[in-house]
Structure formats: C-alpha cells, structure tokens
C-alpha cells in the first residue's frame, strides 16, 4: 500500500483531457441563410406622368349629384313672358257702327294723322290734313262717329279775290276780272258729313 502512487488531483496534468475522453470537438456546419418569404419588387418604369391638357380643370366630386330638373346651360337666360305678348293697337268701337276703327297717331314731324276704319269687309284709310283737298274723302265723322264719304262744296276764297284784283290791275275790265270767281279749282273746298251735315274740314287754296 505504501508503494502505491497517490491519486491524481482532478484537473491536474495527469487528468485526462475532455478532448481525449470524448474525442475532438465537432465543428458545427454553417447553416444557410433563411430564404426570404417575400421579396419586394420595384414597379416597372412606366415613363413620365401623362400630360394634363387642362391644368386649371378640377375634376368634380364623384359623390355630388346635381338635383333633378330641367338643365339650363350657362349663359342662357329664358326670355320673359312679356316678350311674347303681341302689341295691342289702339282701337275704339263706335256705338252705332258694325266694325272697329283703329287710329294711328301722327308722326313727330308731320301735322297729318292716319285713320283706319274697318266696317264689315270695307277698310278705309284717311290722312288728316293735306288729304282733304278738292275731292271727297272716306273718313269717320267726328260728330256722328259713322264711316262716311265727305260731301264737298266750293266757296269763293282768298285766291279768287287776289286773282280778280290782278285782272283789274292788268286792264281786264267789263266783267273779265270776275272770271276767277267762277273757276272751282280756285275756290276753297268745304268737306261736310252727308249724315249729320256737320263741317268736317275746310280746304283753303291760300291761307
């Protein structure tokens, strides 16, 4: 017993190495990198954005809907109802006549007027003033309000008197100076109503 060697101390030089007991340490093989589940792909290049022809145009809101009803385009204004009303001529109806008389007022620079008389199927148009001359005229009597044709009568006027004086001055005597007094074209003309005998107008050859 005394000749036996002392037991080796754990961890001493005589202790067998862990490598000798279990062998050389095994080298771990490198593991491959995990394959990514999804790879991000960049979108293909489609070129520059499309050109906007109307840079100031704003697209309407898709959630807006115009109210139902008639559509009126911009810049259009419906005409007022007064534009479709036909003009009403000034007309009056005589109490004893069957037709209707329409009177148009005279113009601003003329002293003569216009009278249009319609009786059944007869239309009479009269211009007051110069139209009353040496012949009968169709008109409406201002007194009896009847459409009539005036009755004329010739009367000696100023022109007859002046022509008689002129004939005496040039030597026409023995009654020759009275010749202008028997010429109707030199006399004044009086227009009267054949119904009520009222004087309508007197046409004077010389005022």
Swiss-Prot record:
GO biological process: intrinsic apoptotic signaling pathway in response to DNA damage by p53 class mediator
Region (Disordered): 1-54
Superkingdom of origin: Eukaryota
InterPro entries, sorted: LITAF, LITAF_fam
Binding-site list for Zn(2+): 141, 144, 193, 196
GO CC annotation: cytoplasmic side of late endosome membrane; cytoplasmic side of lysosomal membrane; nucleus
Bias (Pro residues) ranges: 1-13
PROSITE patterns linked to this entry: LITAF
Residue stretches spanning the membrane: none
Record comment regarding domains: The LITAF domain is stabilized by a bound zinc ion. The LITAF domain contains an amphipathic helix that mediates interaction with lipid membranes.
Protein's name according to its UniProt entry: Cell death-inducing p53-target protein 1
Species of origin: Xenopus laevis (African clawed frog)
